[in-house]
Amino acid sequence: MIWRFFLSAMILLISSAAYSQPNKVPPFKMINPDGKVFRAENLPLGKPIVIIYFSPDCEDCQQLIKELLNRIKELNGASIAMITYLPMDKVKQFVTENKLDKYSNIFIGTEEGSYFVSKYYKIGKLPFMALYNKNGDLIKIYNKEISIEDLSIRLKEL
């Protein structure tokens, strides 16, 4: 009986560890348009990381991506992970419409059904963006007004 309690307590502690590091890049996973699993640890090392949680159907999200692509040269030094909760057909359509597959620093996919990223950040409104330095330390969370200009300035400082 004591052994079961101890084992349960250990499992709880270990499983909560993933959620207890809000100042680090979350250990997310998503499915890319090519059907492969992409994990946070697959992001290139030594570069700042931008995580964008979005919906292809969201007008504010579409506007954010247009602004991001207009200034993509300023963001080339960062890895950009774009994550949605919607099904893969929506992701593929969004990638095609915005020609996102031509950018080697943009990683896009769906966490369809898990909502891990949404829960991790307690996201209430889209789009959502988080900026991390090259060591994976949180620099800034953008959850109200998202400014690509501010993001660009902060990336230059890193």
Annotate each language-model stretch with its function.
Residues 1-24, 158:
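Bacterial Sec-dependent N-terminal signal peptides
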Residues 62-100, 115-117:
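Structural microenvironment flanking redox-active thiols in thiol-disulfide oxidoreductases
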Residues 99-126:
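Short, internal strand/loop/helix patches
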Residues 24, 47, 124-126:
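Short, small/polar residue-rich loop motifs at catalytic or cofactor-binding pockets
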Residues 31-32, 110, 132:
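Hydrophobic alpha-helical segments, especially N-terminal targeting/anchoring helices
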Residues 125, 131-158:
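Thiol-/selenol-based redox modules, centered on thioredoxin-like
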Residues 41-62, 68:
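Short active-site neighborhood of thiol/selenol oxidoreductases, capturing the structured segment around
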Residues 18-41:
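N-terminal "domain-start" segment that seeds a small globular fold
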